[in-house]
Every structure is written in structure tokens, then in C-alpha cells.
């Protein structure tokens, strides 16, 4: 821990915004993980729901949606209660899908910003540190001293910035992939429900 604190101070003032970025990445990752876990109805639900609708077992599909957690299951269960016909259901599904996708994308832009910003902050810290290292001169001989050590310390900021960026990139890629899977499952369920409504003549 003491060595970590020592490196932190050697990295310069830019280490503070990098620390804030790393804390933000961890906080966003935890919040998004819990949100996705709560809102994801799961691929098995989507597959079973579509299978039941294609088999014209609409009541069983409705009961499955009612008994399943997650936003996708809730939306299709609510849509099945609409009695005005297919067009009303379609409008409801589209509006709810837009709201849900916006919720899924929430805070992911922050991770993307940190991916780009962290290496730049690290580079800035390194440049400032190198300027400081090259400005040190031995007043007696006129020769620069401690330049190598100064550059080594300055590179701490770049290394830290890259680590934060990699962490943020991994988190962003994971949640973007999971979001794509959830959207795909949702679209499959919506299509199956609308096809079932078409077959029923509503």
C-alpha cells in the first residue's frame, strides 16, 4: 500500500483525475451489472416464449411472461393484455422498447469517454513530468541531472492512464455485448407476439 501511495504521488497532479476515473468505472460497472441482472429476462425465456407462441399456446406464453422477471417479460405480458388489436400492440411495443433501450444505454457513454480521456490524461502527466525532469540542472557543472529518474516517474502517469482505459474498455465491451443480446431477445419476443396476433386475425 505504501508503495502504491508513493507511485501515486510521483505520478503528479494528473493522478487525481485518473483516480476519480477509476472509481467512476468501478461504480458504473457495479451499477450496470446489478441493473442488467435485474432487467434481463434471459435467452431461455425468449426461446421458450417464442416456441409457445409459434405452437399457438398463447395462454401458456402469457403465464410464462407473467412469472418471469425482467423488462422484456413485463413488456410482452402487458402487451398481451391490450385488446384493441395488433396495431395498438405494435405501437405499445415500440414505445416501450425505446424506453428500455435508453435505460440499457444509460451511463455507457461515460465509460466510452473514460476510455478516450484516461490515456490523454496520462500522456499529459508524462509530458509535464518530462518538462520538469529536463529543467533540472546541476548549477555547478551545467549538466542535467536526474533526468532518467524524472522520466521514469513521469511515465507512471501514462501507465496509470492506460490501466484505467483498459479497465473501462473491458467494462464497456461487456455491457455493450450484453445489451445487444438483451435487445435481440426482446425483438424476437416482440416479433413472435405480433405474428401470433396476425394469425389470430386481430
Can you say where each PLM-predicted feature lies in the sequence?
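Hydrophobic membrane-targeting segments
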Residues: 1-44, 171
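Alpha-helical membrane-interface segments at transmembrane helix boundaries
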Residues: 2-11, 94-118, 144-156
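Lipid-exposed faces of alpha-helical membrane segments in multi-pass integral membrane proteins
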Residues: 17-30, 114-124, 160-164
Amino acid at each position: 500500500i505504501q508503495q502504491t501511495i508513493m507511485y501515486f504521488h510521483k505520478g503528479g497532479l494528473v493522478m487525481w483525475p485518473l483516480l476519480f476515473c477509476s472509481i467512476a468505472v468501478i461504480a458504473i460497472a457495479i451499477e450496470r451489472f446489478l441493473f442488467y441482472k435485474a432487467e434481463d429476462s434471459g435467452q431461455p425465456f425468449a426461446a421458450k416464449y417464442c416456441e409457445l407462441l409459434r405452437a399457438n399456446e398463447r395462454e401458456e406464453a402469457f403465464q410464462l411472461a407473467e412469472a418471469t422477471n425482467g423488462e422484456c417479460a413485463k413488456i410482452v405480458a402487458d402487451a398481451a393484455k391490450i385488446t384493441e388489436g395488433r396495431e395498438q400492440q405494435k405501437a405499445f411495443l415500440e414505445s416501450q422498447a425505446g424506453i428500455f433501450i435508453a435505460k440499457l444505454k444509460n451511463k455507457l457513454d461515460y465509460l466510452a469517454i473514460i476510455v478516450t480521456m484516461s490515456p490523454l490524461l496520462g500522456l499529459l502527466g508524462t509530458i509535464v513530468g518530462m518538462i520538469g525532469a529536463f529543467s533540472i540542472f546541476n548549477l555547478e557543472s551545467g549538466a542535467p541531472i536526474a533526468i532518467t529518474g524524472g522520466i521514469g516517474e513521469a511515465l507512471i502517469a501514462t501507465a496509470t492512464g492506460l490501466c484505467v482505459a483498459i479497465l473501462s474498455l473491458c467494462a464497456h465491451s461487456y455491457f455493450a455485448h450484453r445489451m445487444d443480446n438483451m435487445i435481440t431477445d426482446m425483438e424476437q419476443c416482440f416479433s413472435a407476439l405480433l405474428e401470433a396476433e396476425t394469425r389470430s386475425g386481430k
